[in-house]
UniProtKB/Swiss-Prot annotation:
Organism the protein comes from: Heliothis zea nuclear polyhedrosis virus (HzSNPV)
Annotated glycosylation sites: 125
Protein name per its UniProtKB record: Occlusion-derived virus envelope protein E56
Bilayer topology: Multi-pass membrane protein
Recorded GO CC terms: membrane; viral envelope; virion membrane
Chain's gene name: odv-e56
UniProt xrefs under InterPro entries: Baculo_ODV-E56
Length: 175
């Protein structure tokens, strides 16, 4: 499901917020993967803009590298002077618009806490750096193995001492 969730979404809260119905706002989504539209509920209309020409111009001049988001006019918390800001005050209570960024492999690595393995200072890059000597390439792996072996050794010592201690004498019960 990676890369399938990105876009501008209209959310309607139901049953006091217990349920939420969401649909994709096609014209506010500037990077749209048309191959995944079958997996997404597309809104039949925009809740704030009725004019189709105005809707079609929302993403006009969009530049992904500069804007660093896949949506326009979809974030009520953005700077009001930015292209991402939307005023949701005309919407009914329990209704909102939000931008959901696509989920990619980098996000998955970060969520799993494996980001220390990547990057210039990451374990994988250090072990595959072509300008390093063989020892420098193997050093991170040796350190990790050393730590694992140390933990196993300490566990062995603790368990061995516990097994060598005699059991405590039975308690005398006065009846």
């Amino acid at each position: 499901a990676l890369r399938r969730t990105g876009g501008s979404y209209y959310h309607i809260g139901l049953n006091g917020g217990e349920q939420v119905e969401s649909c994709l706002l096609r014209y506010r989504t500037c990077v749209l993967d048309v191959n995944n539209l079958n997996d997404v509920n597309v809104c039949p209309s925009d809740p704030l803009i009725d004019n189709i020409n105005a809707l079609q111009s929302v993403c006009h001049g969009y530049n992904a590298e500069v804007e660093r988001t896949v949506c326009r006019r979809s974030d009520p918390n953005a700077d009001p002077l930015s292209l991402q800001y939307v005023d949701i005050s005309p919407l009914a209570t329990g209704h909102t618009i939000s931008c959901i960024e696509p989920y990619d492999f980098g996000d998955l690595i970060g969520d799993l806490g494996l980001d220390g393995l990547l990057g210039e200072e990451g374990l994988l890059n250090k072990s595959s750096d072509k300008s390093s000597t063989s020892f420098q390439k193997l050093l991170p792996i040796i350190v990790v193995l050393g730590i694992v072996l140390l933990i196993i050794f300490i566990g062995y010592i603790v368990i061995k001492r516990m097994l060598m201690q005699p059991p405590p004498p039975p308690a005398n019960y006065n009846r």
